[in-house]
Amino acid sequence: PYKDTTREFQWKKMKERLSLLESIQKEPFQWAILQNYKNRNGEAPLVKVFKRDAYKRVSDTLGVERYQSVPLYLLTDTVIPEIYGRDGSLVRIKAMDEDSKFARIQTVYDGEEEWYAPKKYIKQIGDTVVFDKAIFVDRHNQNIATLEHVGSKWLVRSMNPATTGQHRPPYAQETPLGMYVLQEKKSRMIYLVDGSKETGGFAPYANRF
């Protein structure tokens, strides 16, 4: 129990996602991460159909914001992107032509769809990487669980309460659903007071997906 709510760990959903993680590794693939943290690789072009979300930011029809995202193009049209891919998302590389500025990729979370993405937004991580650790963030129950694959079993390494993002425009945003690769570890992560550049505090031993 926590205040007026009861938190629980959704083991059934975790089991389903662990099965997915195992299944995508049964055959060797060239893996990659979509990267555009803080638009470091360039602001993504406007998609064909866009809107302003509750934060007054440009987003695609699926609600993915343009800011720090990666433009994804239909296989039949590399002029204007169709949707945005989230920074940190795990993808497969299906084709990488040296003479093209695009790579053909395939998503692995919530459907296997193929897209073209500009190479400058893609970080290759090879075909020998093994995903044997998983961190589950539960937005509803506000908790986090870490598991490790040892032998033929997934072992629970930690279970803790966690404060995830909340949908509170114009500043606070909910943690987006998806399958992300750990990109950065920090001894401390500084956060700001909403709507200002004033430091609000820090979180120790933070991981950025």
Sequence positions of predicted segments:
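Short, intrinsically disordered, charge-balanced linker/junction segments flanking boundaries
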Residues: T61-V64, K94, Y205-F209
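A short, compositionally biased
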Residues: R66-Y67, E98-K101, V137-N143
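Gly/Pro-biased beta-strand-loop elements
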Residues: K119-F209
